[in-house]
UniProtKB/Swiss-Prot annotation:
Source organism (scientific name): Aliivibrio salmonicida (strain LFI1238)
Listed GO MF terms: rRNA binding; structural constituent of ribosome; tRNA binding
An example Gene Ontology biological process: translation
Keywords carried by this UniProt record: Ribonucleoprotein, Ribosomal protein, RNA-binding, rRNA-binding, tRNA-binding
Domain of life per record: Bacteria
SUPFAM superfamilies found in the cross-reference section: RL5-like
Keyword rRNA-binding belongs to the record: yes
Stated name of the protein: Large ribosomal subunit protein uL5
Length: 179
């Protein structure tokens, strides 16, 4: 079991129950899933770019990504409905906890000029979204084998009802919010 999951069960549940005065431990917010998304618009011209992006995402997440396709045609972007334009991975369970642990303790501190992540990126229902500009902040990615620096979107879906509860949950995991 991941250290962060143990920590959640042993300390965070008690902290949040006390802070928000929940009547049951089932009311305590928990991390339900983490979704990683990488849009590769340039894949229209070069299919190899999408394959490389999917390979990078598989290394980062530990599971095979789903290739996303365009939902509708957009003439301005020269894409047609059904064209492969990105990839995504949904992490749950043990892999989710391990990824969250690596993100907070290893990957985010490796970002250049890092001052913390914005505390305003909550969606109103306790879910947090953030973007990473370079996939090379993850230690699994070999810098010499990267063909192009790509960013990815990370969405952390929680069972929290409000942004305050979601922020308290992520802050309990030492999520580096900007002061």
């Amino acid at each position: 079991m991941a250290k962060l999951h143990d920590y959640y069960k042993s300390s965070v549940v008690a902290e949040l129950t006390k802070e928000f005065s929940y009547s049951s431990v089932m009311q305590v917010p928990r991390v339900e899933k983490i979704t990683l998304n990488m849009g590769v618009g340039e894949a229209i011209n070069d299919k190899k770019l999408l394959e490389n992006a999917a390979a990078d995402m598989a290394i980062i997440s530990g599971q095979k990504p789903l290739i996303t396709k365009a939902r509708k045609s957009v003439a301005g972007f020269k894409i047609r409905e059904g064209y492969p334009i990105g990839c995504k991975v949904t992490l749950r369970g043990e892999r989710m906890w391990e990824f969250l642990e690596r993100l907070v303790s290893i990957a985010l501190p490796r970002v250049r000029d890092f001052r913390g992540v914005s505390a305003k990126s909550f969606d109103g229902r306790g879910n947090y979204s953030m973007g990473v500009r370079e996939q090379i902040i993850f230690p699994e990615i070999d810098y010499d084998k990267v063909d192009r620096v790509r960013g990815l979107d990370i969405t952390i879906t929680t069972s929290a009802n409000t942004d305050a509860e979601g922020r308290a949950l992520l802050a309990a995991f030492n999520f580096p919010f900007r002061k």
